[in-house]
Amino acid sequence: MFIIKSMLYRLMQMIVVLFVISTLTFILMKLSPGNPVDKILHLDVAQVSTEQINATKDKLGLNDSLLVQWWHWMNHLLHFNLGKSFESKEPVTQILFNYAPITLLISFSTLVVSLCISIPLGIIAAKRFHKWTDKVIRVISTLSISLPAFFIGIILLFIVTNLMNIDSVILSQFILPVITLSLGMCAYIIRLVRSNLLMLLQSNIVQASRLRGMNERYILIHDLLKPTILPIIPLLGISLGSLIGGTVVIENLFDIPGIGYLLMDSIKSRDYPVIQGCVLFIGFFVVIINTIADLLTLLLDPKQRLQLGNPKNKTNTPLISESSDRHA
């Protein structure tokens, strides 16, 4: 019962946040410089008749009050109608559908690559605590966090195009961006896995398993793997949302026709309907992914369910992630 209430509460939070994002997007577009009528007519206002300008404003609903315009905006949004591009005259929804797949492909590929690399490295670092393997992994993780993604991307582009003379679309528009985005994400996951595993290795469950004569592989798989990975789920939600936002820079650096590239191109041409669509897509995606991550954590983590069932234990039942800094 408590789980259902908590899930409903998180879903309500998501709806409220999406509503706020939509309203803020509407306000920001209204405060942005320039007149959409000028952009649509593609002419200087002095060369256009007053009747033509008023007719265009009536068609766009610009003569209505802001409250009425907002109401129409929200109503159209609920029907997935984001208007038409000033430049191409295509529906914004269709444009987003054309550009979104490559962005989502790069983001989810980055997530998979990061998990496949960081979880084993985090386990190795914890099992070889304070040995040279652990130190090397920690140094590489620190460097990956310290260097900006665009700087890593520039270095990779220079190595591949100038030093290796490789000209490949798949390499430059998919493999290199995934590597660039994965490095920073891997570093955070490695540190989290390492810290959680170091703490769990000192737990009573592990000590009891060792006393029963269980080997280290059995203990790792049956006793440690699940509680080590569970705290990663909220981090993945945050990271995946950040990846979508981070693609704005990476897609323009690698010339990838995704949402980030579309957003920058629309800002340059002041194509406001497309800008609104891109901002809403990124905002909605981040909120929905984080909500899904919270719900998965709630369903899979027994400590979360215990805290919901007995709120008095909330301060007395520490989560794994709270003690992670001790071994960082």
UniProtKB/Swiss-Prot annotation:
Keywords: Cell membrane, Ion transport, Membrane, Nickel, Nickel transport, Transmembrane, Transmembrane helix, Transport
Positions of the ABC transmembrane type-1 domain: 100-297
GO CC annotations, alphabetized: plasma membrane
Superkingdom of the organism of origin: Bacteria
Membrane topology, from the record: Multi-pass membrane protein
Subcellular location: Cell membrane
Residues annotated as transmembrane: 11-31, 104-124, 139-159, 170-190, 229-249, 279-299
InterPro entries linked to this entry: BPD_transp_1_N, MetI-like, MetI-like_sf, Opp2B
Major subcellular site: membrane
GO molecular function, one term: nickel cation transmembrane transporter activity
A Pfam family per the record: BPD_transp_1_N
Subunit-structure text: The complex is composed of two ATP-binding proteins (NikD and NikE), two transmembrane proteins (NikB and NikC) and a solute-binding protein (NikA).
Biological role: Part of the ABC transporter complex NikABCDE (Opp2) involved in nickel import. Probably responsible for the translocation of the substrate across the membrane.
Family the entry assigns: Belongs to the binding-protein-dependent transport system permease family. OppBC subfamily.
Name of the protein in its database record: Nickel import system permease protein NikB
Organism field: Staphylococcus aureus (strain N315)
Gene name tied to this protein: nikB
